[in-house]
Amino acid sequence: MKQTIVILLSLLSLSATAQEYLPQWQKGYLDFHSIATGQGESTFIMMPDGTTMLVDAGDVGELWTKVHLPDSSKTPGEWIAHYVKHFAAPLDEPSNVDYFLLTHFHSDHMGSHRKPGSGYFDVLKTLSFDRVIDRAWPDYDFPSKESIWKSSKVMDQYVDAVRGQVSEGTVAEQFKIGSRKQISLLYEPKKYDFEVYNIAANGRMHTGKGMKTKQMWPDWFDVKKYDENVFSCAFTVRYGKFRYFLGGDLSGATDSQKDKSPRDFETQIAPLVGPVTVMKANHHGYKDSTMPVFLWTLRPDVIVVQCAEDGHPKTVTANRFLDPVYPGRRDLYITGDISRVDLGEEIWSHFRPYGHVVVRVYEGGSSYQMFVLDPYSYDYRIIYKSEIYHL
Protein backbone atom coordinates (compact mmCIF):
# COMPACT_ATOMS: atom_id res chain seq x y z
CA MET A 1 0.00 0.00 0.00
CA LYS A 2 2.80 2.41 0.94
CA GLN A 3 4.56 1.60 -2.31
CA THR A 4 1.36 2.41 -4.27
CA ILE A 5 1.03 5.77 -2.51
CA VAL A 6 4.65 6.62 -3.25
CA ILE A 7 4.16 5.77 -6.95
CA LEU A 8 0.99 7.90 -7.15
CA LEU A 9 2.71 10.84 -5.47
CA SER A 10 5.63 10.49 -7.85
CA LEU A 11 3.30 10.52 -10.85
CA LEU A 12 1.49 13.61 -9.54
CA SER A 13 4.81 15.34 -8.99
CA LEU A 14 5.95 14.41 -12.49
CA SER A 15 2.69 15.74 -13.96
CA ALA A 16 3.10 19.05 -12.12
CA THR A 17 6.68 19.53 -13.22
CA ALA A 18 5.78 18.60 -16.80
CA GLN A 19 3.55 21.66 -17.19
CA GLU A 20 5.15 24.20 -19.49
CA TYR A 21 4.80 27.98 -19.45
CA LEU A 22 5.58 30.66 -21.98
CA PRO A 23 9.13 31.92 -21.41
CA GLN A 24 9.16 35.59 -20.44
CA TRP A 25 9.30 38.21 -23.15
CA GLN A 26 12.79 39.61 -23.60
CA LYS A 27 14.27 42.45 -25.61
CA GLY A 28 14.25 41.63 -29.30
CA TYR A 29 11.00 39.62 -29.11
CA LEU A 30 7.73 40.78 -30.66
CA ASP A 31 4.72 39.15 -28.99
CA PHE A 32 1.06 39.26 -30.02
CA HIS A 33 -1.42 37.96 -27.43
CA SER A 34 -5.01 37.35 -28.58
CA ILE A 35 -6.65 37.28 -25.16
CA ALA A 36 -9.49 34.79 -24.66
CA THR A 37 -12.27 36.08 -22.41
CA GLY A 38 -15.26 34.68 -24.31
CA GLN A 39 -16.79 38.17 -24.42
CA GLY A 40 -14.98 40.06 -27.16
CA GLU A 41 -11.69 41.02 -28.78
CA SER A 42 -8.49 42.19 -27.14
CA THR A 43 -4.92 41.96 -28.40
CA PHE A 44 -1.86 42.80 -26.31
CA ILE A 45 1.33 43.59 -28.24
CA MET A 46 4.81 43.67 -26.70
CA MET A 47 7.26 45.24 -29.14
CA PRO A 48 10.98 44.46 -29.43
CA ASP A 49 12.17 47.36 -27.25
CA GLY A 50 9.48 47.01 -24.58
CA THR A 51 6.93 49.39 -26.08
CA THR A 52 3.43 48.01 -25.40
CA MET A 53 0.01 48.40 -26.98
CA LEU A 54 -3.44 47.06 -26.13
CA VAL A 55 -5.83 46.87 -29.07
CA ASP A 56 -9.50 46.77 -27.99
CA ALA A 57 -10.98 45.53 -24.73
CA GLY A 58 -14.33 43.96 -25.53
CA ASP A 59 -17.14 42.86 -23.24
CA VAL A 60 -20.56 42.17 -24.74
CA GLY A 61 -22.17 41.92 -21.32
CA GLU A 62 -23.71 38.51 -22.04
CA LEU A 63 -25.60 40.08 -24.93
CA TRP A 64 -24.51 37.24 -27.22
CA THR A 65 -22.92 34.66 -24.95
CA LYS A 66 -22.66 33.63 -21.33
CA VAL A 67 -19.15 32.24 -21.79
CA HIS A 68 -16.62 33.65 -19.32
CA LEU A 69 -12.95 32.70 -19.57
CA PRO A 70 -11.34 31.62 -17.35
CA ASP A 71 -14.43 32.10 -15.12
CA SER A 72 -16.86 34.75 -13.90
CA SER A 73 -14.95 35.70 -10.75
CA LYS A 74 -13.70 38.76 -12.64
CA THR A 75 -15.18 40.77 -15.48
CA PRO A 76 -13.62 40.41 -18.95
CA GLY A 77 -11.97 43.81 -18.54
CA GLU A 78 -10.48 42.75 -15.22
CA TRP A 79 -9.19 39.51 -16.77
CA ILE A 80 -7.65 41.47 -19.65
CA ALA A 81 -5.84 43.71 -17.16
CA HIS A 82 -4.74 40.67 -15.14
CA TYR A 83 -3.38 39.04 -18.30
CA VAL A 84 -1.50 42.16 -19.39
CA LYS A 85 0.13 42.62 -15.98
CA HIS A 86 1.14 38.96 -15.91
CA PHE A 87 2.97 39.05 -19.24
CA ALA A 88 4.29 42.60 -18.86
CA ALA A 89 6.07 41.57 -15.65
CA PRO A 90 9.57 41.83 -17.24
CA LEU A 91 8.97 45.55 -17.89
CA ASP A 92 9.63 48.35 -15.41
CA GLU A 93 5.96 49.33 -15.14
CA PRO A 94 3.71 46.32 -15.90
CA SER A 95 0.56 48.35 -15.12
CA ASN A 96 1.40 51.10 -17.60
CA VAL A 97 0.75 50.49 -21.30
CA ASP A 98 2.18 52.87 -23.88
CA TYR A 99 -0.72 52.76 -26.37
CA PHE A 100 -4.39 51.85 -26.32
CA LEU A 101 -5.97 51.56 -29.77
CA LEU A 102 -9.73 51.16 -30.13
CA THR A 103 -10.51 49.89 -33.62
CA HIS A 104 -14.17 50.96 -33.56
CA PHE A 105 -17.12 51.67 -31.29
CA HIS A 106 -18.81 48.32 -30.67
CA SER A 107 -19.35 46.53 -27.35
CA ASP A 108 -17.29 43.47 -28.24
CA HIS A 109 -14.33 45.81 -28.67
CA MET A 110 -14.94 48.45 -25.97
CA GLY A 111 -17.59 47.34 -23.43
CA SER A 112 -21.35 47.12 -23.04
CA HIS A 113 -24.12 49.21 -21.47
CA ARG A 114 -25.50 45.99 -20.02
CA LYS A 115 -22.68 45.96 -17.51
CA PRO A 116 -21.77 49.54 -16.50
CA GLY A 117 -18.01 49.98 -16.33
CA SER A 118 -17.28 46.92 -18.46
CA GLY A 119 -14.55 46.30 -21.04
CA TYR A 120 -12.23 49.25 -21.49
CA PHE A 121 -13.59 50.91 -18.36
CA ASP A 122 -12.74 47.90 -16.19
CA VAL A 123 -9.26 47.80 -17.73
CA LEU A 124 -8.75 51.39 -16.60
CA LYS A 125 -9.19 50.34 -12.97
CA THR A 126 -5.86 48.51 -13.17
CA LEU A 127 -3.94 49.76 -16.20
CA SER A 128 -2.94 53.25 -17.31
CA PHE A 129 -2.26 54.36 -20.88
CA ASP A 130 0.14 57.01 -22.12
CA ARG A 131 -1.66 57.35 -25.45
CA VAL A 132 -5.23 56.57 -26.51
CA ILE A 133 -5.95 56.32 -30.23
CA ASP A 134 -9.34 55.84 -31.86
CA ARG A 135 -10.96 56.64 -35.19
CA ALA A 136 -12.87 59.80 -34.17
CA TRP A 137 -11.10 61.86 -31.48
CA PRO A 138 -11.76 64.68 -30.59
CA ASP A 139 -15.17 65.50 -32.10
CA TYR A 140 -16.61 61.99 -32.50
CA ASP A 141 -18.82 63.13 -35.36
CA PHE A 142 -18.08 60.90 -38.37
CA PRO A 143 -20.20 59.98 -40.17
CA SER A 144 -22.37 61.79 -37.60
CA LYS A 145 -22.62 61.98 -33.84
CA GLU A 146 -26.02 60.34 -34.08
CA SER A 147 -24.67 57.29 -35.90
CA ILE A 148 -21.72 56.86 -33.51
CA TRP A 149 -23.90 57.12 -30.43
CA LYS A 150 -26.34 54.67 -32.02
CA SER A 151 -23.54 52.14 -32.55
CA SER A 152 -22.59 52.12 -28.87
CA LYS A 153 -24.66 52.97 -25.82
CA VAL A 154 -21.53 53.65 -23.78
CA MET A 155 -20.19 56.48 -25.95
CA ASP A 156 -20.86 59.14 -23.31
CA GLN A 157 -18.97 57.04 -20.80
CA TYR A 158 -16.13 56.37 -23.24
CA VAL A 159 -15.67 60.02 -24.26
CA ASP A 160 -15.75 61.10 -20.61
CA ALA A 161 -13.16 58.44 -19.77
CA VAL A 162 -10.79 59.54 -22.54
CA ARG A 163 -11.16 63.22 -21.67
CA GLY A 164 -10.60 62.37 -18.03
CA GLN A 165 -7.38 60.59 -18.92
CA VAL A 166 -6.27 63.55 -21.04
CA SER A 167 -6.78 65.86 -18.07
CA GLU A 168 -4.33 63.66 -16.16
CA GLY A 169 -1.65 63.65 -18.85
CA THR A 170 -2.67 60.95 -21.34
CA VAL A 171 -2.36 61.96 -25.00
CA ALA A 172 -5.44 61.25 -27.15
CA GLU A 173 -5.19 61.12 -30.93
CA GLN A 174 -7.22 60.23 -33.97
CA PHE A 175 -5.85 57.28 -35.96
CA LYS A 176 -3.70 58.82 -38.71
CA ILE A 177 -4.21 56.98 -41.99
CA GLY A 178 -0.96 56.57 -43.89
CA SER A 179 1.26 57.18 -40.88
CA ARG A 180 4.21 54.92 -40.17
CA LYS A 181 5.20 56.93 -37.10
CA GLN A 182 2.07 57.42 -34.99
CA ILE A 183 2.61 54.02 -33.36
CA SER A 184 6.32 53.40 -33.04
CA LEU A 185 9.06 52.04 -30.82
CA LEU A 186 9.53 54.47 -27.94
CA TYR A 187 12.67 53.23 -26.19
CA GLU A 188 15.17 51.93 -28.75
CA PRO A 189 13.68 52.85 -32.13
CA LYS A 190 16.94 52.67 -34.08
CA LYS A 191 17.89 49.23 -32.84
CA TYR A 192 15.14 47.22 -34.56
CA ASP A 193 13.77 46.97 -38.12
CA PHE A 194 10.19 47.59 -37.01
CA GLU A 195 7.19 49.52 -38.34
CA VAL A 196 3.46 49.95 -37.74
CA TYR A 197 1.67 51.12 -40.89
CA ASN A 198 -1.79 52.70 -40.53
CA ILE A 199 -3.73 51.65 -43.63
CA ALA A 200 -7.40 52.56 -43.23
CA ALA A 201 -10.12 53.94 -40.96
CA ASN A 202 -13.41 55.81 -41.26
CA GLY A 203 -14.03 54.35 -44.70
CA ARG A 204 -10.86 55.96 -46.03
CA MET A 205 -7.59 54.35 -47.03
CA HIS A 206 -4.03 55.44 -47.69
CA THR A 207 -3.19 56.01 -51.35
CA GLY A 208 0.36 54.79 -50.79
CA LYS A 209 1.77 58.27 -51.38
CA GLY A 210 2.74 60.65 -48.58
CA MET A 211 -0.19 61.09 -46.21
CA LYS A 212 -2.83 61.22 -48.96
CA THR A 213 -6.04 59.28 -48.44
CA LYS A 214 -9.11 58.45 -50.51
CA GLN A 215 -12.64 57.43 -49.62
CA MET A 216 -13.65 53.84 -50.22
CA TRP A 217 -17.37 54.36 -50.63
CA PRO A 218 -18.89 55.61 -53.93
CA ASP A 219 -20.13 59.20 -54.05
CA TRP A 220 -23.71 58.13 -54.67
CA PHE A 221 -23.88 56.14 -51.43
CA ASP A 222 -25.01 57.76 -48.16
CA VAL A 223 -22.10 57.06 -45.81
CA LYS A 224 -24.42 57.40 -42.80
CA LYS A 225 -26.11 54.14 -43.83
CA TYR A 226 -22.99 52.10 -43.09
CA ASP A 227 -22.66 50.18 -39.84
CA GLU A 228 -19.74 50.89 -37.51
CA ASN A 229 -17.72 47.85 -38.62
CA VAL A 230 -16.61 49.29 -41.95
CA PHE A 231 -15.03 52.28 -40.20
CA SER A 232 -12.59 50.05 -38.30
CA CYS A 233 -8.93 51.03 -38.00
CA ALA A 234 -6.71 48.66 -39.99
CA PHE A 235 -2.93 48.39 -39.76
CA THR A 236 0.06 46.12 -40.27
CA VAL A 237 3.00 45.44 -37.99
CA ARG A 238 6.32 44.58 -39.64
CA TYR A 239 9.40 43.25 -37.87
CA GLY A 240 12.16 42.17 -40.23
CA LYS A 241 10.58 39.64 -42.59
CA PHE A 242 7.55 39.07 -40.36
CA ARG A 243 4.24 40.86 -41.07
CA TYR A 244 0.98 40.86 -39.10
CA PHE A 245 -2.38 42.34 -40.15
CA LEU A 246 -5.14 43.51 -37.82
CA GLY A 247 -8.27 45.22 -39.14
CA GLY A 248 -10.92 45.19 -36.41
CA ASP A 249 -14.28 44.32 -37.95
CA LEU A 250 -13.45 45.56 -41.44
CA SER A 251 -15.84 44.01 -43.94
CA GLY A 252 -15.86 42.62 -47.42
CA ALA A 253 -18.98 41.76 -49.34
CA THR A 254 -20.67 38.62 -50.53
CA ASP A 255 -21.85 38.50 -54.13
CA SER A 256 -25.43 39.12 -52.99
CA GLN A 257 -24.43 42.22 -50.99
CA LYS A 258 -22.35 44.01 -53.59
CA ASP A 259 -25.32 45.44 -55.50
CA LYS A 260 -27.16 46.55 -52.35
CA SER A 261 -24.37 47.86 -50.14
CA PRO A 262 -20.93 48.82 -51.47
CA ARG A 263 -19.06 47.68 -48.37
CA ASP A 264 -16.25 45.69 -49.91
CA PHE A 265 -13.42 47.64 -48.31
CA GLU A 266 -11.27 44.52 -47.92
CA THR A 267 -10.60 44.26 -51.64
CA GLN A 268 -9.61 47.92 -51.83
CA ILE A 269 -7.03 47.80 -49.05
CA ALA A 270 -5.66 44.35 -49.89
CA PRO A 271 -2.91 45.57 -52.28
CA LEU A 272 -1.66 48.01 -49.62
CA VAL A 273 -1.58 45.26 -47.01
CA GLY A 274 0.15 42.74 -49.27
CA PRO A 275 1.37 39.29 -48.18
CA VAL A 276 1.48 38.76 -44.42
CA THR A 277 2.71 36.05 -42.11
CA VAL A 278 -0.20 36.19 -39.66
CA MET A 279 -3.59 37.87 -39.84
CA LYS A 280 -6.42 38.32 -37.40
CA ALA A 281 -9.59 37.37 -39.25
CA ASN A 282 -11.68 40.46 -39.95
CA HIS A 283 -14.99 40.68 -38.08
CA HIS A 284 -14.31 37.48 -36.13
CA GLY A 285 -14.59 35.46 -39.33
CA TYR A 286 -18.23 36.45 -39.85
CA LYS A 287 -19.82 35.74 -43.24
CA ASP A 288 -19.18 39.27 -44.56
CA SER A 289 -15.43 39.17 -44.02
CA THR A 290 -12.16 37.58 -45.10
CA MET A 291 -13.29 37.09 -48.67
CA PRO A 292 -11.35 35.03 -51.27
CA VAL A 293 -9.66 38.01 -52.98
CA PHE A 294 -8.50 39.33 -49.61
CA LEU A 295 -7.11 35.93 -48.62
CA TRP A 296 -5.45 35.46 -52.00
CA THR A 297 -3.71 38.83 -51.72
CA LEU A 298 -2.59 38.49 -48.08
CA ARG A 299 -1.75 34.76 -48.26
CA PRO A 300 -1.35 34.34 -44.50
CA ASP A 301 0.42 31.32 -43.06
CA VAL A 302 -1.62 31.75 -39.87
CA ILE A 303 -5.19 33.00 -39.33
CA VAL A 304 -6.35 33.89 -35.81
CA VAL A 305 -10.07 34.14 -34.98
CA GLN A 306 -11.15 36.05 -31.87
CA CYS A 307 -14.70 35.05 -31.00
CA ALA A 308 -17.51 36.40 -28.86
CA GLU A 309 -20.61 34.61 -30.14
CA ASP A 310 -21.91 31.68 -32.13
CA GLY A 311 -21.00 32.43 -35.73
CA HIS A 312 -17.44 33.46 -34.94
CA PRO A 313 -16.48 32.19 -37.46
CA LYS A 314 -19.30 31.27 -39.80
CA THR A 315 -19.02 27.96 -41.65
CA VAL A 316 -18.82 29.71 -45.02
CA THR A 317 -15.86 31.79 -43.81
CA ALA A 318 -14.10 28.82 -42.22
CA ASN A 319 -14.41 27.04 -45.56
CA ARG A 320 -12.78 30.06 -47.20
CA PHE A 321 -9.89 29.72 -44.74
CA LEU A 322 -9.42 26.13 -45.89
CA ASP A 323 -10.01 26.70 -49.61
CA PRO A 324 -6.70 26.48 -51.50
CA VAL A 325 -7.13 29.92 -53.10
CA TYR A 326 -3.41 30.48 -52.51
CA PRO A 327 -0.48 28.06 -52.22
CA GLY A 328 1.26 27.13 -49.00
CA ARG A 329 0.15 26.28 -45.52
CA ARG A 330 -2.52 28.00 -43.47
CA ASP A 331 -2.77 27.22 -39.76
CA LEU A 332 -5.98 28.14 -37.93
CA TYR A 333 -6.17 29.37 -34.34
CA ILE A 334 -9.19 30.46 -32.32
CA THR A 335 -9.82 31.89 -28.84
CA GLY A 336 -12.99 29.92 -27.98
CA ASP A 337 -15.16 26.96 -28.96
CA ILE A 338 -18.57 28.62 -29.09
CA SER A 339 -18.94 27.85 -32.83
CA ARG A 340 -17.69 24.28 -32.63
CA VAL A 341 -21.11 22.62 -32.96
CA ASP A 342 -22.19 24.77 -35.90
CA LEU A 343 -18.88 24.32 -37.70
CA GLY A 344 -18.92 20.56 -37.24
CA GLU A 345 -16.04 18.34 -36.23
CA GLU A 346 -14.54 18.07 -39.70
CA ILE A 347 -13.93 21.83 -39.95
CA TRP A 348 -13.17 22.15 -36.22
CA SER A 349 -10.39 19.58 -36.53
CA HIS A 350 -8.39 22.08 -38.61
CA PHE A 351 -8.15 24.51 -35.67
CA ARG A 352 -5.47 24.19 -33.01
CA PRO A 353 -6.72 23.87 -29.41
CA TYR A 354 -8.58 27.03 -28.41
CA GLY A 355 -7.34 29.53 -25.84
CA HIS A 356 -5.11 32.57 -25.59
CA VAL A 357 -3.25 32.65 -28.91
CA VAL A 358 0.32 33.93 -28.76
CA VAL A 359 2.53 34.75 -31.72
CA ARG A 360 6.17 35.10 -30.65
CA VAL A 361 8.51 36.62 -33.22
CA TYR A 362 12.14 36.05 -32.33
CA GLU A 363 14.89 38.65 -32.46
CA GLY A 364 15.43 40.10 -35.91
CA GLY A 365 12.01 39.09 -37.22
CA SER A 366 13.16 36.15 -39.31
CA SER A 367 11.50 33.38 -37.27
CA TYR A 368 8.39 32.95 -35.15
CA GLN A 369 6.49 30.40 -33.09
CA MET A 370 2.83 29.91 -32.16
CA PHE A 371 1.55 29.09 -28.68
CA VAL A 372 -1.89 28.46 -27.21
CA LEU A 373 -2.30 29.07 -23.49
CA ASP A 374 -4.95 27.44 -21.30
CA PRO A 375 -7.96 29.80 -21.19
CA TYR A 376 -9.23 28.21 -17.95
CA SER A 377 -6.09 28.51 -15.86
CA TYR A 378 -4.88 31.50 -13.87
CA ASP A 379 -1.22 30.86 -14.67
CA TYR A 380 -1.58 30.45 -18.46
CA ARG A 381 0.13 27.12 -19.00
CA ILE A 382 0.92 26.10 -22.57
CA ILE A 383 -1.53 23.63 -24.11
CA TYR A 384 -0.08 23.80 -27.63
CA LYS A 385 3.08 25.06 -29.28
CA SER A 386 4.17 24.90 -32.90
CA GLU A 387 7.57 24.38 -34.34
CA ILE A 388 9.69 27.47 -34.97
CA TYR A 389 9.01 28.74 -38.49
CA HIS A 390 11.77 30.46 -40.44
CA LEU A 391 10.93 33.16 -42.96
Could you tell me what each predicted segment is?
Residues 60-62, 106-110, 139-140, 205, ...:
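Short acidic, S/G/P-rich loop/turn micro-motifs used as interaction or catalytic elements
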Residues 97-108, 279-283:
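Metallo-beta-lactamase
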Residues 258, 263-358:
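Long, structured stretches of catalytic cores involved in phosphate-ester chemistry, encompassing
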Residues 41-45, 53-55, 61-66, 205-210, ...:
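Short, solvent-exposed loop/turn elements at domain surfaces
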Residues 25, 50-100, 115-122, 253-272:
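Pre-active-site segment of Zn-dependent metallo-hydrolases
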Residues 4-14:
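Sec-dependent N-terminal signal peptides
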Residues 20-31, 37, 83-86, 92-99, ...:
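Flexible, acidic/histidine-containing loops and adjacent segments that form or flank the divalent-metal
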Residues 32-33, 53-55, 101, 244-246, ...:
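Residue-level marker for buried hydrophobic side chains located in beta-strands
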